[in-house]
C-alpha cells in the first residue's frame, strides 16, 4: 500500500477472505497468515495517515475546515480503496462493514446523503463476490459508504447510441484462442446482480470494470484491431455516460512492449483508471502525449498489492 501511495496511485486493492469474524488479506488461501488482516494492513495505516493529514492548525485557525486526503500536494484527491471479496459475499459483508467503522467515525468515507454524494478522502468500492443488493440496501449499507464495481462489459454504447456491441472474438479462428485462468471471473449466473446497465449509477457504483482478456479478446499479432477498439471505446463511453469510472483489469503483462501498447491505447481512448501491478513501469512512462492524463490526478489503480 505504501509503495502505491508513494508512486501517486489513487487506487489500492485488498483481497479479503472471511473466516469467522476475521478478515485476512492475500491473493490465495495458502498465502494467508494470522497477522495479515485487513485491519493491520489497511485500516490502521490509512487511519494513521489521514489522522496526521488532518491535525488541526496551530498557528491560524481555519474557519472552514475540510478534510484532507492522503496526498499532501493534492489534499482534495480521494483515494479509491477497493475491497475484493474472495469468500461468499453475504457472509463476508458484515465483517467488512464493521472493519470500516474507525474510518467511518472519523468522517473519512465518501458516502451518499439525501441523494447527494458527499466526497471524503476515501472511496470504498466492493468487487469480486460483493453482493450488489447489499450495497443498495439501507439495512446492510445504512451509511451508504460502500460502492459497487459495476460490470463494464454491460455498458457498451456506440457512437450513435446503439447498445449492441460488436463481437471481437468472432473475428479470429477458434484455434487462436488460448486457454486462460477463469477462476477470478465472476458471471451473472453466480451472483444475482442486475444485467440492466442502467441499474448502476454514481449513487451505488464508482468503477465500471471488466477483464480485458474476457471482454476484448486475444490480441492477434500483438495488435488491437478496429473492432476491439470500438468495443473499448463503446464500453468506456457507456460507463462515462452513466457517471462511472471505466477500468480494465487482466490486461496483458508480458511482453513489456505489448503491455505498454495496451496501456497507451486505453489511455488514448479515455479510460479513467489504469490497472497496474508494475508501479515502476507505470511511473517511468512518459504520459505527456496523452492530454496530460498522468498529471490530471495519477489515475492509477494498483493491483496485486499485499498491503506493504
Model-derived features: positions:
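General structural concept
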Residues: 1-16, 22
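Catalytic cores of phosphodiester-bond hydrolases, prominently lipid phosphodiesterases
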Residues: 6, 21-308
Amino acid at each position: 500500500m505504501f509503495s502505491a501511495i508513494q508512486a501517486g496511485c489513487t487506487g489500492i486493492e485488498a483481497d479479503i477472505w472471511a473466516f469467522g469474524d476475521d478478515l485476512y488479506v492475500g491473493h490465495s488461501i495458502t498465502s494467508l497468515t494470522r497477522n495479515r488482516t485487513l485491519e493491520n494492513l489497511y485500516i490502521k495505516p490509512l487511519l494513521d495517515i489521514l489522522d496526521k493529514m488532518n491535525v488541526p492548525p496551530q498557528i491560524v485557525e481555519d474557519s472552514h475546515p475540510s478534510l484532507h486526503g492522503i496526498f499532501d500536494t493534492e489534499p482534495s484527491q480521494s483515494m479509491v480503496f477497493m475491497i475484493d471479496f474472495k469468500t461468499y459475499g453475504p457472509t463476508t459483508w458484515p465483517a467488512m462493514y464493521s472493519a470500516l467503522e474507525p474510518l467511518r467515525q472519523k468522517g473519512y468515507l465518501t458516502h451518499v446523503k439525501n441523494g447527494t454524494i458527499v466526497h471524503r478522502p476515501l472511496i470504498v468500492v466492493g468487487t469480486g463476490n460483493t453482493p450488489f443488493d447489499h450495497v443498495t440496501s439501507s439495512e446492510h449499507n445504512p451509511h451508504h459508504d460502500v460502492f459497487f464495481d459495476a460490470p463494464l462489459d454491460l455498458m457498451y454504447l456506440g457512437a450513435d447510441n446503439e447498445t449492441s456491441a460488436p463481437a471481437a472474438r468472432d473475428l479470429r479462428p477458434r484455434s487462436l484462442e488460448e486457454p486462460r485462468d477463469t477462476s477470478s471471473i465472476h458471471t451473472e449466473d453466480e451472483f444475482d446482480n442486475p444485467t440492466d446497465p442502467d441499474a448502476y449509477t454514481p449513487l451505488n457504483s464508482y468503477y465500471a470494470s471488466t477483464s480485458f482478456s474476457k471482454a476484448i479478446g486475444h490480441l492477434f499479432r500483438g495488435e488491437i484491431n478496429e473492432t476491439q477498439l470500438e468495443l473499448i471505446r463503446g464500453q468506456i463511453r457507456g460507463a462515462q455516460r452513466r457517471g462511472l469510472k471505466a477500468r480494465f483489469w487482466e490486461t496483458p503483462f508480458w511482453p513489456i512492449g505489448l503491455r505498454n501498447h495496451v496501456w497507451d491505447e486505453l489511455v488514448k481512448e479515455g479510460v479513467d483508471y489504469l490497472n497496474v501491478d508494475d508501479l515502476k513501469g507505470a511511473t517511468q512512462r512518459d504520459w505527456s502525449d496523452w492530454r496530460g492524463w498522468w498529471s490530471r490526478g495519477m489515475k492509477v489503480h494498483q493491483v496485486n498489492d499485499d498491503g506493504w
